[in-house]
Design a protein with these regions (language model features):
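Transmembrane-cytosolic junction motif
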Residues: 15-40
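Feature marks short, highly hydrophobic, charge-poor N-terminal signal-anchor/signal peptide-like helices
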Residues: 1-9
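Alpha-helical membrane-embedded segments
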Residues: 8-16
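Charged, low-complexity intrinsically disordered regions
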Residues: 32-50, 56-233
Length: 233
């Protein structure tokens, strides 16, 4: 292969790379404008990115602070932050991508809640399929045993304080989360997150970004999860 052909191929690859970067950047700008408009409609504040102080809060959660797992430290890219504080409940939404994954389809929609009405053990609810659950249980790693058939077939609960987390999960909550099995949930103290997780092992079908047309409905469901796990005011 001649030097001329090699240089041509390098140039072509460079041009295509720049083209796709431009398209991706333009798409992100358009998506951010739509989120900004949506925030105004819902009485929330919009910011394109998240500050470092809030990022530190997220390390309280298993999802963002598990150094031994490939899904840990997913704080590389955070976009489209919507925020409000009503009746002492701080609520945020943001999109978060795995470290090194860029954006595009690889962003999780995450709802964050902070309130004095929350007093949670450090727990993590992860969506699993029944075969994975059975495999883990055979090695004694099946997590907290929850007496709810539908929930136990779909979810793995990890928490060091098993009695507290069992008391926390009412039958109504377990029924609700089982029928809306696109959610994972993490809690710790006065904070919690409700999100659609992505896993490299293929254990969930929640690959892709939230459709803005379904945002209000998904937010309502996330708020309902928060209410199930909060103490009466």
């Amino acid at each position: 292969m001649s030097i001329g052909v090699i240089l041509f191929l390098i140039f072509t690859i460079f041009v295509l790379t720049q083209y796709f970067r431009f398209r991706s950047k333009k798409h992100e700008q358009q998506r951010s404008k739509l989120f900004q408009r949506l925030a105004g409609q819902m009485g929330m504040q919009f910011s394109a990115k998240m500050g470092s102080d809030f990022r530190k809060r997220l390390k309280a959660f298993n999802r963002f602070n598990n150094r031994t797992h490939r899904q840990g430290h997913r704080l590389s890219t955070i976009r489209n932050v919507l925020r409000n504080n009503v009746n002492g409940v701080e609520t945020l939404f943001f999109e978060c991508s795995p470290r090194g994954a860029g954006t595009g389809r690889n962003m999780e929609p995450i709802f964050y809640f902070k309130s004095s009405s929350l007093n949670l053990p450090n727990f993590h609810i992860r969506h699993f399929n029944i075969h994975q659950n059975l495999f883990l249980k055979s090695f004694g790693k099946g997590g907290v045993q929850i007496d709810h058939a539908a929930f136990s077939q779909k979810y793995l609960v990890q928490c060091s304080d098993e009695n507290t987390v069992r008391k926390l999960f009412s039958d109504e909550f377990l029924d609700f989360i089982s029928s809306n099995d696109s959610f994972d949930v993490d809690g710790n103290g006065d904070q919690m997150i409700v999100y659609r997780a992505m896993y490299e092992d293929g254990s969930t079908n929640n690959i892709g970004r939230i459709d803005l047309n379904e945002f209000k409905d998904v937010k309502q469901k996330a708020v309902k999860v928060y209410k199930y796990l909060s103490r009466p005011g």
